[in-house]
């Protein structure tokens, strides 16, 4: 309520998750919301991005990847999991992530 008042009474969507906020703003059921930049992919014609918050305020948003140990997996499944893991870390995958607004230019 305080933020809404500070912005002149603008309705702010407070949803369960940022995807719901994005949908509410895109559909026009609220005027403004905060979401991940990567979630805006495909909504460019329905949204005006007002501000991209810098990493010094938010910190890096990290999506970890790992391979779990699965004693029930056969050799083919285990090899496929390892191949997928390697692909996700590859330059080719980084280009895909970048195309969908994920920033891959971070320190490891």
Go through each PLM region and give its residues.
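Exported/periplasmic ABC-transporter solute-binding proteins
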Residues: 1-108
